Amino acid sequence: IRMMTKDHEYLYPYSAQEAKKRNQLPMWRESYHANVACRKAIEETVRQNFDGMHLKKDCLEPVLAEYGYKRTEWVLATTLQELSWDGRFSRANKQWAARRYIPQDERHNAEITVRSHPAILDGFVDLYREAYQKLGLFGPEHCVGDRAEQDYIGKVLVLSPDTLKESFWSQENQLWYAHDGFGCSPHAIGRSVRCTCLSDGEMTRWNRDEFVGVLDEKFLPDWAKESLSQFQQEESAESPGMNNQSM
């Protein structure tokens, strides 16, 4: 796995209630305060960079530099989910926000709801989505099949950007070849998948739910095709030997 940019403070993915159950309230609190600070930074950058007609294109950069993509997305998605009744947000942006799981937490979610004018904030969401798109990361739209029913053995899997720190965000760090493990089976209780990174050959275990799904072959980059055929050759060379031993 190769590192790209700096790391940002950990984004805690559960509600305060869930954090209490898990005995993780300090982690939740730290992340929540950062979410509120990110909300205020968005409000400030929108205020400073809107000239009455247009929002400056580069107004997103200081927010991303300070808070990162994950937290910025969390705050924007929470805002659009909280204000889903507001017709000033585009349908496309509302649908985008709805795809992001935000835990129910009425009081705290209200605190991270951006208070900028919705029509201007909608433009800010557009800028964020464009910036994320330019990163060229793999997502559910690059995967095939029904994740709930798929067997992962021998497949190229897409590691979720949520699983990786932002400093490791790249296609090279997302593509993994699944060897075995209980997590390869959709209905097993065990979740672990033993796999190898196609770009650098690092072998490790990830949990099944840390993957977005199985990559559609048409999106497989050339550099990954070589590694993949090498793994497939090695595995097919190993399997006849194993069959002979069992006879």
Please tell me what each predicted stretch does.
Residues I1-S246:
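Gram-negative host-targeted secretion-system effectors, predominantly Type III and Type IV
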